[in-house]
Amino acid sequence: MRGITLLACFTSVFADGNDPRDFDSDLLMPGFHFVPFPWDWQNDPNGPMWDPVHEKYHLFYQYQTPRMWGHAVSDDLVDWVQLPMALKREHWYDQGGDFSGSATVLDDDASTVVLTVSSSDNTEIFVALPEDRSDPYLTNWTLPDYNPIYTTDARDPTEIMKTSKGTYRIADGTAVGTEIWEVNAFEDIFTNDTWTKIGTFQSNDGGAYWECPDVFPLPGAEEANLWVSKYSRSGDHYYLGMYDEDAATFTPLERYEGNPKTYDHGPFYASKTFLDKKDDASRRVLWGWQRMDKPEDTWQGQTQGVPREVKALPVTGSNKVDESPFYLTNFPIKELETLRDEDSHVANALPGGAQSFEIHDDEPVLLDAVSGRMLDMKFDIDYLNDGAQACGIRVLWTPGSDEYTDVLIDQRWVRYRATKNIGCWHHHHCFHSPRFPRLSVKQERKNYLANSHIFICLHSITTHRFAPYSLALTENNVGTDVNFRVLVDSSIIEVFINFGEETQTLFSYPTTSTSVSVGLIGAHCVFHSFESWNMNPYQFDASLVM
């Protein structure tokens, strides 16, 4: 009965007038990426969590300047109710800001929910508790008098983790890596004299702070004791390795030593996962902050990426090497598909409704059956020969103009160059895929500013990083297909290659409402099974803060 009552509550608040978004006047406003209201700065997704008592998802995030904690709640990780701020700089230790941390539902009865928070000067770690645990929204939070629980030169504490021995641990980020603090009993969590630093989970020899650490067993690889150690520093990077609970240490797999992988090769940062136990399922859901390089005056171009499921997939065949038969993927959660407009579904979107379509030159081919500012598309590409260079799709396109964004896989060795008429900058991003190591994602967009061009390439470089996976297009593997999932949301594009084996967030800045067309582009490749949907915006109720 509780589920029915809460659903009725959500239905009533999603009434006309409670959603402040205006998609007609703001061409860049995303429809299915979370943006908080009132419009203001947001960044790190501090404390995503599932509350089993009230059957709600919560999202906490860095909000405004100086930083405080914003808060929203959902039944399904798709539609959201905006709540008042959870933390608002009310004590001596958080006057400079309530900076990043995590949320934890403690113990089997789930009676206790704790926010772990860091201070602006990276010295104080403190906790917050809900004022009323019976409130299904957990609207109001309090900072107990025993705060801060410990003082250290660290930041961004993780959730509180219970060990097999019944002790409780927190990991936080430091200039020398990820450190571990521990208390022996549940009641000791809520004191300021029992937390003890027990060691360094993983060392960082670079001397730069590891921000927003995340530590968790990789779903699907638990029997192999395969864990993820993630940190944020000029991107969100992770290692796969072995966790020794007794020693509280992490040892990366040999192929990851000194060479972490990356969740997303675009502006995706300060990510945080949580264990989702809804419907007795145990999945790991990933949130990440996406920051535009062209901030908006209203919502400031700061969004959260779509929630993604993190899990292991097996490495098969000749690519199975070293200690682990698994690799990590991150891919949109299934619930996102509820926003698909089924009336707009095109099962065979290629020209003529064909299952396959071959292109041989670089002239774009318009897809008459697909158009829109908010789209979900999936398709495969085969590369025909070693003359195949870059193949992909053109989106947010006004045919006959320079208003478009190309999302391409480029199998050549390419370099990265970006030029704007407001300055010039150069950068390199590298990834090496276990199955397609010489493929790269390239984006070209010509709509940032008038007469400006931006070329973005993810590229592989000659390296021994993953030498056992070396692959080139030869007579033996021509025809190997690459799977795409592309989400377009007005100004945000998320690209998932091979079901989340590699991902990239991109931004585009259309200037006209006619930039809605989609096309194929490339040479010497074949597109297969192109399927598309227009997407509906999520339901957003901001009435509690209006």
Identify what each model region corresponds to.
Residues 210-213, 268-271:
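Repeated scaffold domains used in trafficking and secretory/extracellular systems
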Residues 17-20, 234, 244-269, 275-546:
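Beta-rich accessory regions
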